[in-house]
Amino acid sequence: MKSIIFNEIKKILECDFALENPKDKNLAHFATPLAFLLAKELKKSPMLIASDLASKFQNHDCFESVEAVNGYLNFRISKTFLNELANQALTNPNDFTKGEKKQESFLLEYVSANPTGPLHIGHARGAVFGDTLTRLARHLGYKFNTEYYVNDAGNQIYLLGLSILLSVKESILHENVEYPEQYYKGEYIADLAKEAFEKFGKEFFSEENIPSLADWAKDKMLVLIKQNLEQAKIKIDSYVSERSYYDALNATLESLKEHKGIYEQEGKIWLASSQKGDEKDRVIIREDGRGTYLAADIVYHKDKMSRGYGKCINIWGADHHGYIPRMKAAMEFLGFDSNNLEIILAQMVSLLKDGEPYKMSKRAGNFILMSDVVDEIGSDALRYIFLSKKCDTHLEFDISDLQKEDSSNPVYYINYAHARIHQVFAKAGKKIDDVMKADLQSLNQDGVNLLFEALNLKTVLNDAFEARALQKIPDYLKNLAANFHKFYNENKVVGSANENDLLKLFSLVALSIKTAFSLMGIEAKNKMEH
């Protein structure tokens, strides 16, 4: 709607201007401070200029009123125009708020957890954010592909195999074992040990077979990770292996060398990242010739940046903050524009239950499992809460609040609005088709404002995507639900003289809730279950 209004205003004003959304919808639906910008040029007061501009909008179909207030030009949208938009939305509900196909393309890499165990609650935040960003981008018409980078090489995979071997020796073969300082523990390791013993037999469990054992376990863990994601309605397009990039390492090093991006010192090869804003240079090849994790990651990012996407986006844990300058430096040395590599950081999550810290999972040792939380509160509540705050801010929540059936539980509160609307239609014995001819002229000011808010979802979605600020969607839904409940409690609907106008208004509110929830990966309920 905002873009339509902007274009209508531009036809009359014939110049560029900023169009704002005032918080107080009783004051205006849209406003522009254009008069303040023109004051210096025209050598007149903003108040006079705003009055002159307002006079150009007399009898315009889109606007109920255009007023000059303290130098601002305030626009109120007409019921006739809002009704036209309502008809379009209700006639094609599946296309509501959808964007036209765009040429801009994105590659999002996210989750990319080591395949050494099930996903924990820290992984879940980036996973939910990435999946919702994907749904939103595609809805708005962008080309958007997703990828999971599987760290299937290096020490952590060997450590997985070693941990299973030691578990077999200790728990099944009853041998005395000495555990290293770092190893994987938890019931899932014991379960893998039992399964491996049944599959491979006693003779297999020796140090020389650790790589084979690790490979087998890594594949099992990747299946489990995909199941964890699926449980939260998350599907990633493709999984790429770190090992598949081994052969490209030498060519990448040559390219970095040509661009003076690396140098040798102390028997190691260093990335000269301090030249590009990093706090110091970084080792990418060790003294024994083995590449560091950074080396493999540079090769992978070089491949991603070479695939022709307009922008490559990564979602990383906040503990990777210091990793950003070195990766951007490497891309600059390789001839890429590092602005086309965008990093979104997912901050830590603190989980409570009845005000106390949530218990760690026995299955995973020191972590809270994503699957445990989904089992307890459902994927809808999990997704909502992870999207309720900006991704790079710390999130603390008490899962007990998400099990309440009152306004303190936002998922329940918003769903209750959606279900209430279905209930009202049932009580009136009507369907949406029965109210399509209603012209909405009888709506009072609160009704018009509620209709405007429901139709303004597209603006919220665009803002949320462009700013990568997905919390704008749940914020919008909370406000919409609150305004609906207030309006419903203050206005008689079934049996009123303007029943059809009110039902048509409500159907728009329901459509906005359903559309926004769908983009968040949440199902809007038609009936509340107690």
List each model region and its residues:
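Short, charged, solvent-exposed linker or helix-capping segments at domain edges/interfaces
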Residues: E84-A89
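Non-catalytic interaction-recognition regions
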Residues: M1-N83, N94, K98-H530
